[in-house]
């Protein structure tokens, strides 16, 4: 669903690493954001912070983001724009698909500096998928939607070959697109194992994170716009699904779960709320430790709507959530959140080498420095 329906729906690849320690160096550094000033005899260190990178695209809003590493990232946004950096954001190359200027890219999944898949959203033929194998020098359109009722929101990959894309309901059920060759070809999965959608229920294409994976087969999708906000889970790559009602705001087209992040197949985070600037968003975050069967609301949630969320690499406890009014940090696996930055971002993504990136309106792309 865009607007943050037609302009704001949400997917992500299961790129977060598993760690054996509670908080790694990156996460520990982030925890410093919640600490007091250094002692009189301690050297002063600047706390971890977002450092904006000049993309040269002030008119573009980036809701699609793929962090390959600290040096390499892809961003996808309005006006058919796709950017890529391989030098930590010092320079950006415009690698937009030719003839895509009227499209809105809302998700990008990148396997490395050369291979990436981007999703354009919209009704009917506006929903498309493109793939590149040469860093964006050339693109192949691998899918163009022909179902007038479909509206694709986000995509996610299990590995370099297997992936899914999510559409709003068609004939009463969410539609799932599947690829087994890295996004070169796609097919619609049968909907026999998909529970019926609620009236008005849809995904939010707000950050590329309404569809996320962990491991070889587990995938979750997030919904809103209906009486209940829900998360649906599949353990067989999208063939069968089970739905769980969420403790996040619902009951309005502007409310629901906007983004998910799983650090493994059991532990996940959900963020969302009401995307309208004038509306409060209580209960804007929740967490699960059983793969999404049950969810508990955060005891101290973000103070406003959040559209993106990402675990810190190799951490069991630290994660970031972003939205138009700022960035929040949790260091206790989603129980409590604290605002640590007030800049506007729509999406956030982290790579295993501790490279974390955020992107949003007015061409804003930033890397976490620490």
Which functions belong to the PLM regions below?
Residues 41-370:
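Residue-level hotspots at or immediately adjacent to binding/recognition sites across diverse folds
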Residues 2-6, 12-41:
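Secretory targeting and sorting signals
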Residues 7-10, 59-61:
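Composition-driven detection of intrinsically disordered, low-complexity segments
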